[in-house]
Design a protein with these regions (language model features):
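Intrinsically disordered, low-complexity, mixed-charge
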Residues: 1-80
Length: 80
């Protein structure tokens, strides 16, 4: 399976609700590498790399997020 790297901006109520920690836990569960951080504009930025099917699974998960999050937008691009 090919490895891919994805970069996302997640908007909505995604800060102060455990979004970063939950994203790290989901990425670990999917055996992905990467990082996640809060941005000053209220969004969360995520970069991750791994097998394509697992990377796409995290992309789908970001659209829902953890229980207390309210995701309103996810912008994803594939990195070279």
């Amino acid at each position: 399976m090919a490895r891919i790297c994805l970069h996302a901006y997640v908007g909505g109520r995604v800060q102060g609700v455990g979004f970063r920690q939950a994203t790290r836990e989901e990425a670990d569960r999917l055996e992905l590498d990467g990082w996640v951080r809060n941005l000053d504009d209220g969004r969360v930025e995520v970069v991750w790399e791994g097998e394509e099917d697992r990377a796409k699974a995290l992309e789908r998960w970001l659209g829902r997020g953890p229980r207390h999050a309210e995701v309103s937008a996810v912008e994803v691009e594939q990195m070279p």
